[in-house]
Amino acid sequence: AKETAGELLKKTVADAVETGVVKVGNQEIFVETYEKNPRLVILGGGHVSIPVAEIGKLLGFHITVMDDREDFVTKERFPQADERITGDFETLSEKIPPYENAWYVVVTRGHLGDSACARAILKRPFAYFGMIGSKTKVRITREKLLAEGFTEDQVNSIHAPIGLPIGGQMPAEIAVSIMAEIVQEKNRHFRTYCDEEVEAAIRLGAAGTMVTIMEKKGSS
């Protein structure tokens, strides 16, 4: 069957996002994708979450931290967080909107909120969803989600156990492995991230100059 114009356009756009190139006749046009600044949503305010938030902020993420214990999401504990939310993880869908370009890190206390977080996240769009835990804990959670009706593709989209296998044991080392995996996924396809203020100016039609840095040398 022939592709409709809509289907062809959708495929062309998808190919452009995937490869960074779109073919028009005999010409190739290079495409640069702009997205909103990435949001790092950390579910659980324990020891690992603190360095995850610190590294995430250094990497330019908007930081949201949620925990069911009020004293674990204080400004003193997470000064770098843009949002600090207290609530039962069952209320995640109510407390946290389905942001565009969201990166979820699930590190709940004793894994008690893992399933609730997973249910909510798998029902919304996400750029990344990682969950901490041993292979046994992860397997149990996966089986539970499959039994609840989530597809294998959905469950397999979870990065669990979370992080790159660098053998870290300390909270800071685990945080490095988590954020290293996130950076790896984020850079798998080149994106240019647009600050919210810049995006607002573009929408309002404000004048400006677009500059693309082609090469950096030294400590620039």
What are these regions (language model features)?
Residues A1-D68, K75-E76, Y99-W103, E185-S220:
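Segments forming oxygen-rich coordination pockets for charged ligands
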Residues I132-E196:
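Adenosine-phosphate binding glycine-rich loop
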Residues A53-I55, R77-F78, P97, A116-A120, ...:
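Short amphipathic alpha-helical segments
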Residues M66, W103-G110, R119-K144:
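ADP-ribose/adenylate-binding Rossmann-like module
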Residues D82-D88:
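Conserved SAM-binding strand-loop segment of SAM-dependent methyltransferases
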Residues S49-I50, G113-S115, V138:
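Short, well-ordered alpha-helical microsegments
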Residues E90-E100:
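Short amphipathic alpha-helix with an adjacent loop that forms part of the alpha/beta core around
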Residues F72-D82:
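Short loop/helix-cap segments at secondary-structure boundaries that form the rim of catalytic
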